Regions:
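Alpha-carbonic anhydrase
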Residues: 2-28, 32-257
Length: 257
């Protein structure tokens, strides 16, 4: 949960409120493709700590299950290709799907159901021009179909037991789905939920815009062996290149909590 503990001066508060209002207005619009009018608002982007605007942001209330059964699936982009089962594509990944109603996130009075989470290597979002070995995306949707993605960077360090359980069931391309039980989804998030937030898009086709992005500032850790386990599936990576930020503002409550 995110709570406000430090006051801002009136100018900063007004700037933050205006930026939040703009971000909320965009996210409440009907989903649109990258061909909509105006400059593209695509993801991922490069985030610079000194280039973000600090603001008191709506709290995140995360309700992820601690004993879930997920379905591990390989997501393909070349199903029509004769050699597709042996070729790795940039937009392919392994995805963990959850039954409806299994997990949710509340932000700004709106409830978003957790649909699935997946991984990219190296990370798609950069932090101060640096990438991480892995980035996780937790994909949510509200009752109106609006999308919110929580991103989590993964750095080398201590073993993550939950990640290890999932990576023991990574399914290869063209193989059948695998069901994994007793997954503590909440253990895949850092303890602190400070974040960088901006309006962007899906990072795979059809690159739909007006996606709310919440990149948590703190990474989680995984052992080098766990990281290598996922990387071996995508030796050339499976991330999209960083996109132009254009006229967008990245908000952050880092340092305010």
């Amino acid at each position: 949960m995110l709570r406000t503990t430090v006051g801002l001066n009136r100018r900063a508060l007004l700037q933050g409120a205006a930026a939040i209002a703009g971000l909320t207005a965009l996210s409440s619009s009907a989903a649109a493709s990258a061909t909509s009018s105006g400059p593209p608002h695509q993801s991922p982007i490069g985030i610079y700590r000194g280039g973000t605007q600090q603001a008191h942001l709506p709290a995140l209330h995360v309700h992820y299950p601690h004993d879930a059964t997920v379905t591990m699936k390989y997501i393909r982009e070349d199903a029509d290709e004769p050699d597709g089962c042996t070729v790795r594509g940039d937009e392919e990944t392994v995805r963990a799907e959850l039954p409806p109603g299994t997990g949710s996130l509340e932000m700004g009075g709106v409830t978003y159901g957790l649909v699935q989470f997946h991984w990219h290597t190296p990370s798609e979002h950069l932090l101060s021009a640096r990438d991480y070995p892995i980035e996780m995306h937790f994909v949510h949707q509200d009752a109106s179909g609006h999308t919110l993605v929580v991103g989590v960077w993964v750095r080398p360090g201590r073993t993550n037991a939950t990640l290890g359980s999932l990576y023991n069931h990574l399914v290869s391309e063209c193989s059948t789905a695998d069901h994994v039980g007793h997954i503590d989804v909440g253990a895949l998030l850092p303890r602190r939920h400070t974040s960088y937030r901006y309006d962007g898009s899906l990072t795979t086709a059809p690159y739909t815009e007006h996606v709310q992005w919440v990149m948590l500032t703190d990474p989680i850790t995984a052992s080098p062996r766990q990281i290598d386990r996922f990387r071996t599936m995508f030796p050339t990576g499976n991330r999209r290149d960083v996109q132009d930020i254009n006229d967008r503002v990245v908000l952050s409550d880092r340092g305010l909590l």
